[in-house]
């Protein structure tokens, strides 16, 4: 396969997406320790936000073309992520059935939006981003499923820094869906992504737990059909413009300040929308046997947990609990209706701490909901059937939604798995430099010269 050194391509590929403006704010300050490490003044891509916005990915590295859907071997995605310093593009679309954990190396840019057809699905096992420093990962679907390892997350970070995850769709974890659970993980953003349908009997959105020195940003994501931990938060955390839909008896946003250690959080302009709250779970029968049945649940309040060590700037958040098909929530006002609508006793802050980076695309909660309906998840090249189904649940505004145990059981989940993924046809790239001919023609480049990728 052809590999070419390039800096330009990482910037060009980044221009694909649904971006409103670019954040050019100076590197933010971290307490008494001076500035966070400056990984470059250039954003990871236009629209990158939060603590991970300066991730460099595979900038300056080789272009690796994924040419097949095999689990391993030359041209496979597993081979692509096995070495550092790469920009990974796709000549194929479809389902990659993972036989074992997929481990990502450092200094990678994964441009899932370059796939033809309906894009890429990673199915059947977990992925690990642990120690994958300086990672840019965009437009991938990570769907673990019932045949994945019991008690494992669909995706996770146990260590590492300077990562940004954009337009991912992460579902069907058997422990958490997507967790960052580490005292050393830092400078990480998850944005514009779906984190949904964690499988029973441990259906969880994810742990977002660091310490006070290491920041995580969760911006404009959809947590949907997870019984609990949507997410569970500890440490330095920025939670802005997210939608949480159809959580169960565990928790929507869990303020885990009652755990050891303190937290500093910004919780701004999010929408919490109650769903039908039914779930498929194991039920013991009178004869002692176990049967999977659809059971009603009693949902918790949108915020639970938290004590005086959980410090939060909490403004502009709404709660819609009437399940009537209309978005008409009430604002959660800590000084007025907190005890009525929520539980826990965090310490409320009057102003947002300066340690949190400015979110240039931040909006009010209702506009965030509208944006999420249109664009969230791995929406390029197109939104797949699973994500479309989840969005149809969300837009029912309380009338649809199920917490499932097995994605392959059509009684629980009508698609019975990942659905159909069209392969499509990759765009012509005569010189193999990772830029399609029509792009090079449009920007005055030479489609017969691979060296212009580095200009």
Regions found by a protein language model. Name each.
Residues 15-35:
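Bacterial Sec-dependent N-terminal signal peptides
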Residues 324, 429-433, 437:
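Acidic carboxylate motifs that coordinate Ca2+ or other divalent cations, activating on Asp/Glu
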Residues 422-428, 438-455:
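Proline-centered structural pivot motif
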Residues 43-88:
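Acidic Gly/Asp/Thr-rich repetitive segments characteristic of extracellular carbohydrate-active
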Residues 78-84, 95-111, 120-138, 144-161, ...:
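Extracellular beta-strand-rich solenoid/capping regions of secreted or surface-exposed proteins
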Residues 107, 112, 133-144, 159-174, ...:
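Right-handed parallel beta-helix
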Residues 233-414:
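Extracellular beta-rich repeat passengers
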Residues 123-128, 148-156, 172-182, 199-210, ...:
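Extracellular beta-strand/beta-solenoid scaffold signature
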